[in-house]
Amino acid sequence: TQGVSSAASDVYKRQGSKGSDYHLSDLTPKFEVVESPGGLNIGVRRNAGDENYYWRVTPWIMPWYTIVPPYGDNPLHGHAWVPIDDENCFAWTFSYHPSRPLNELELGVMRDGGSLHVQLMPGTFRPVMNKDNDYMIDREAQKARKSFSGVKGIAMQDASLQESMGPVSDRSRENLVMTDKAIFMARRQVHDAALNLDKGETPPGLDEASQAVRSASFELSREIPFNEAPGDPMKVKKGVAHTSI
């Protein structure tokens, strides 16, 4: 799999995808966030012609799951951010397709540390690219404009920014904006769930119905809110492929 580059990740991720065309043609998306029985649904909206919007919807399921919206017939990916202690957590990443096995190209990209997966140091859960080696940033690739960040793979690009904030951030110095709406809504839900748990109430997101959801991407009339899309595109249907364009 060594020959499978991180560029291949983008190839299989978006190849033949109508959603990719919408993504590239509208670089100023709008965010909408609504509460769900088990957490939040985070919608990103782009123009899809004169009458429709192209939606990519990420479910955040209490207390630590996210599922990334798909492109075309490509796999679904997700994360579980599981605390270890007050300053560290495991970031478990999973990939699957509801109606078929993953193919060799998809598996090769993942083994090579592409897409949302990373290569690990043997015998550990620590990524090969990490803070101690500056995430193996490739300055020459940046100079040649082959890579904006110089860091290989979406997962490590994200991790490099997340870890740069330190283990515990000073919330009083944050400057959240409307595109951060999901952040403060999720914090509020976790805060409220903790208080209610202390009163003996069961936290949301633990029942089967709340967990039986998928991410989705779809076109929808501009007149219809994404959380009212016909056919419930985020509902799990066993053996049936996810809703994606």
What are these model-predicted stretches?
Residues D10, G39-L40, E87-F90:
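A generic structural micro-environment signature
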Residues K13-T58:
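Polyanion-binding catalytic cores of nucleic-acid enzymes and NTP/SAM-utilizing transferases
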Residues T1-A8, Y12:
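Single conserved hydrophobic/aromatic residue that forms the stacking wall/gate
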Residues V44-I245:
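Peripheral, non-cofactor segments flanking catalytic/redox cores
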